[in-house]
């Protein structure tokens, strides 16, 4: 697991799946910097009218892109429309330490408890614990903290781990073996699979 800095907070823009797909050819190009600069100015592929929002989206997507290997993004492009959002969730957990902490310390724990639900208040408690040991996070405004919590819960709903009543459910994913093959078995637990389910998938690859 890559050591992620707590300062890599998700700074807005949200999930950005369609925008990621639009920007990938630019990021994969040898003329990346020139093409991204042109996109910031001319809005050729993102179709985000406000320049400030466009710059933020390019920054976030570039950060996520650089977290992963070029080979991963080649794989990403041939995944199905159902698999790509889950793969992007995987990338986000790898990119943003704060989201990874929320997921491991709150969501997975609550899934393994009687509750099997996650609400804003549960995430806020974890935020307060992080703030107590990290001065940088402690310096964030309440509005910023609220945005980060909202972004995380929105991501969970978008990929289907969290329903409208805040109940957690196992993520329905058709390419779980892929994450085992690239040495990221922790992600299956992040998708709320039980150990016996993970073992069954491992055995199918043997």
Question: Where are the model-predicted features located?
Answer:
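Leucine-rich, amphipathic alpha-helical/linker segments
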Residues: 10-13, 17, 26, 93, ...
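N-terminal interaction modules that seed assembly of large macromolecular complexes
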Residues: 19-75
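Short capping segments at the starts of secondary-structure elements
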Residues: 29, 115-118
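Short, positively charged loop/turn segments that connect secondary-structure elements
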Residues: 50, 128-148
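Positively charged, polyanion-binding regions of nucleic-acid-associated proteins
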Residues: 87-90, 94-116
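Accessory, usually C-terminal, subdomains that scaffold auxiliary metal cofactors
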Residues: 141-206
């Amino acid at each position: 697991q890559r050591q992620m800095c707590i300062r890599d907070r998700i700074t807005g823009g949200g999930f950005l799946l369609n925008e990621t797909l639009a920007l990938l050819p630019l990021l994969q190009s040898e003329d990346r910097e020139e093409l991204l600069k042109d996109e910031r100015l001319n809005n050729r592929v993102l179709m985000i009218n406000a320049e400030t929002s466009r710059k933020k989206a390019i920054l976030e997507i570039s950060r996520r892109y650089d977290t992963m290997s070029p080979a991963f993004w080649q794989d990403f492009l041939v995944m199905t429309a159902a698999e790509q959002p889950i793969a992007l969730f995987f990338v986000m957990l790898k990119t943003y330490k704060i989201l990874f902490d929320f997921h491991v310390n709150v969501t997975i724990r609550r899934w393994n408890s009687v509750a099997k639900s996650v609400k804003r208040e549960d995430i806020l408690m974890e935020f307060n614990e992080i703030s107590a040991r990290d001065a940088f996070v402690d310096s964030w405004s309440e509005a910023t903290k609220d945005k980060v919590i909202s972004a995380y819960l929105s991501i969970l709903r978008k990929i289907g781990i969290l329903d409208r009543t805040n109940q957690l459910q196992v993520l329905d994913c058709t390419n779980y073996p892929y994450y085992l093959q690239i040495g990221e078995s922790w992600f299956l637990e992040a998708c709320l699979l039980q150990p016996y389910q993970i073992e069954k998938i491992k055995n199918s690859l043997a």
